[in-house]
């Protein structure tokens, strides 16, 4: 089964361009043109990755990302934010909102595919750990153990290290 990727952008030509590139790599693609629809799709579909435009009218990508990462049912889905904003403060804003990666437009195809594959690998490892251990993801953290009454949490960035131990 191929990975399911949600593309969220208010500009349909941008969606179509990404959709063509991703379906050529055999990914299953869903699309949304606004933040509200993106959240609805994320809540009702099994997704492996979200490509999310940062600047959209209404609910912007930063807010969509914040809401997704606050939802324990969605927090484990990696988000790559896409934007024409090049300033580092916008990248920081996206990362603070919970984005897992950031790609600046215009999008280089090689970088896009490499980052998509990297995030999907991390998602696969997270899914394997969750299925194997039965633990859950909460606010982008995986609780793997407890010391006394206190959970020991690891962010998704430490999972490859844990997995290789």
Can you name each region flagged by the protein language model?
Residues 11-30, 44:
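Two-component/phosphorelay signaling modules centered on CheY-like receiver
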Residues 45-51, 56:
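Active-site beta3 strand of CheY-like receiver
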Residues 103-116, 120:
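C-terminal output helix
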């Amino acid at each position: 089964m191929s990975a399911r990727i949600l593309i969220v952008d208010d500009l349909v030509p941008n969606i179509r361009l990404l959709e063509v590139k991703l379906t050529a790599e055999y990914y299953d693609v869903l699309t949304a043109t606004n933040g509200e629809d993106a959240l609805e799709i994320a809540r009702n579909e099994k997704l492996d990755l979200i490509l999310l435009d940062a600047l959209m009218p209404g609910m912007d990508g930063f807010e969509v990302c914040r809401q997704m990462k606050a939802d324990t049912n969605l927090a484990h889905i990696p988000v790559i934010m896409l934007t024409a904003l090049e300033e580092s403060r916008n990248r920081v804003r996206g990362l603070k909102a919970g984005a897992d990666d950031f790609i600046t437009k215009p999008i280089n195809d090689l970088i896009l595919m490499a980052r998509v594959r990297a995030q999907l690998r991390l998602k696969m490892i997270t899914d394997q750990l969750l299925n194997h251990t039965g633990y859950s993801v909460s606010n982008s953290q995986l609780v793997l153990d407890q010391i006394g009454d206190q959970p020991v949490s690891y962010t998704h960035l430490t999972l490859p290290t844990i997995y290789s131990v």
